[in-house]
Amino acid sequence: RGIQELLLLDEEGNEVSAWHIGGKTSLLIGRDEHKENVDINLQNTEYGGMADRQHAVLNYAAGQWYIEDLGSRNGVRIQNAKDGKMYQVSKEHPCRINTGDIIFIGNTRLGVR
């Protein structure tokens, strides 16, 4: 079935809200007051100010989701569900994400389900 949702998580790891991403192929993560230019809008989240307007992009290719940092100020990190380690995502080097991973957009946590 694969990845179907991104979850906004609080500091304790509880779900605050969710975005359905099943069936999509490309999603822009960022912040936008007008809610027009980004797919995953972090404008009104606790650490939304740490997200760039165009912070990262999720792309679906060959049955897998990948995240790429778009040259953001505060970076993109992934906490891998398998080994629990934190990985920095480099600009122009897409990184595969899997169910159970946690994506950090600055300090904003997005769970992968």
Language model: regions and residue ranges:
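Forkhead-associated
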Residues: 39, 55-57, 62-102
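DNA-recognition element of transcription regulators
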Residues: 52
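Intrinsically disordered, low-complexity acidic Ser/Thr-rich regulatory segments
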Residues: 1-49, 70, 95-99, 107-113
